Amino acid sequence: MIDAHHHLWDLNAVDYPWLMEKGKKRFFGDPTPIQRNYLIDEHIKLAAALGFKASVHIQVGAADGLEEAKWVNKIVSENQSWPMAQVAFCDLSSDQREIQLDELQKLSSVVGVRQIVGRSPAEDANSKTNELLTSDNFMQGLQSISD
């Protein structure tokens, strides 16, 4: 069985601004319990105990999506006994999306990309993700990855 959606983070290796905001409630509740490193060894131990044999890391809102993807790619290459792929972040509304996609394609563990288009009404209004589905640039970005 494959764990098709999990996150890893090393707060010393990659910057996750949303994760480190102290005292801020998120759409999923209080982030305090997860404001710590969650690394591959812990994930493997927990996932294997549940019968998982492989996993897919999903991007988790790093300040620099490419930096996160490179970090995950390194984790994958250093842990050959645990098959893992990743879905990385790409800003599909950006004029630089083709460059981002080219860089991501150089990473052997990347099997897809995502850009979150909805979390909660308040967070979406603040981050403008609520406008993505009506954005011509975003729609062009979606089209570019389907070609």
What annotation goes with each model-predicted range?
Residues M1-D147:
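Helix-coil boundary/capping segments in enzymes
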